Amino acid sequence: MIEPLLCGIVLGLIPVTLLGLFVDAWNQYRRDTVLGDW
C-alpha cells in the first residue's frame, strides 16, 4: 500500500523532471543553433 503523500510526490515530480529536461535540451539546441547561424 503506497501512502497517498508519497504517491502524490512521485506523480508531481515526474512531469516536473520531464519538463526540466525538455527545457534544458531545448535551450541547448537553441543556443547551438544561434551560434551556428552567426
Swiss-Prot record:
GO terms for molecular function: electron transporter, transferring electrons within cytochrome b6/f complex of photosystem II activity. GO terms for biological process: cytochrome complex assembly; photosynthesis. SUPFAM superfamilies: PetG subunit of the cytochrome b6f complex. It is found in: Cellular thylakoid membrane. The chain crosses the membrane at residues 5-25. It comes from the Bacteria. It is a single-pass membrane protein. Keywords: Electron transport, Membrane, Photosynthesis, Thylakoid, Transmembrane, Transmembrane helix, Transport. InterPro entries: Cyt_6/f_cplx_su5 (IPR003683), Cyt_6/f_cplx_su5_sf (IPR036099). GO terms for cellular component: cytochrome b6f complex; plasma membrane-derived thylakoid membrane. Pfam families: PetG (PF02529). Belongs to the PetG family. The 4 large subunits of the cytochrome b6-f complex are cytochrome b6, subunit IV (17 kDa polypeptide, PetD), cytochrome f and the Rieske protein, while the 4 small subunits are PetG, PetL, PetM and PetN. The complex functions as a dimer. Component of the cytochrome b6-f complex, which mediates electron transfer between photosystem II (PSII) and photosystem I (PSI), cyclic electron flow around PSI, and state transitions. PetG is required for either the stability or assembly of the cytochrome b6-f complex. This is Cytochrome b6-f complex subunit 5. It comes from Prochlorococcus marinus (strain MIT 9313). The gene is petG.
